[in-house]
Amino acid sequence: MKLILFDFDGVLADTEKACYQIHTIKNKDLTWKRFQEYSLGNFFEGYDKAVEEGKHIPADDFLGSYKKILDFLTIHEILHESVLSLATDYRLAIISSANTSYINDFLVKEGLSECFSDVLGADIHRSKTFKIKTILTKYHIMPKDTVFVTDTLGDIKEAEKCCVSSIGVTWGLHDRSILEKGKPLKIIDDPQDLVKVIRKI
């Protein structure tokens, strides 16, 4: 294994419940299950479809509210140590639907900015498949030497389009039963198992 790709929200940053709450301000009937369904495929495709069909009202200044969440959020200590450990032996990058500059600011705040060679957010491209291919091409790394750590079925599907395998984590948006549908290499329930699982692949 040469390259470890990380999703951000729900994997490195515990933001998914807060993001859900932001959306419920204008969507009182938005259930957690329906919010999860936006990420069964590409998040933006699911979200945009709901907006176009009149089933979802966009939040006022979502990015501003999201930035405030990151300003006060701290990465879990075990995940912090995991990133530091993995960065000594692998190239690490973040593939996210969040804003690139917000993620970079968070990494600086948490003392992890030097651990990631690249951060590709939604402002780079809305497709994670596109962003994964971009990283593979940039560093001439084969898909078989890459793994994507994510909390959503949609991400697993997008990585699969690049022939990149995934590791699902259950401390984010989707639970084990949903992640299993994408047939990831492994599903991890406890952050302290992350490094061990990756090093065994």
Segments predicted by a language model, with ranges:
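Acidic, Mg2+-coordinating phosphoryl-transfer loop and its flanking beta/alpha structural elements
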Residues: 148-188
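Short, acidic loop-to-helix structural element flanking the phosphoryl-transfer center
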Residues: 67-94, 100, 104, 130
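A short, structured active-site edge motif that brings together acidic residues
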Residues: 35, 113-127
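Short acidic-hydrophobic, aromatic-tinged amphipathic segments that line or gate anion-handling sites
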Residues: 120-121, 186-190
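N-terminal helical cap/lid subdomain that shapes the substrate entry/recognition surface
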Residues: 2-80
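Glycine-rich phosphate-binding loop signature in dinucleotide/nucleotide-binding domains
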Residues: 88-90, 139-145, 201
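Non-catalytic pre-domain segments flanking phosphatase-related domains
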Residues: 1-6, 192, 201
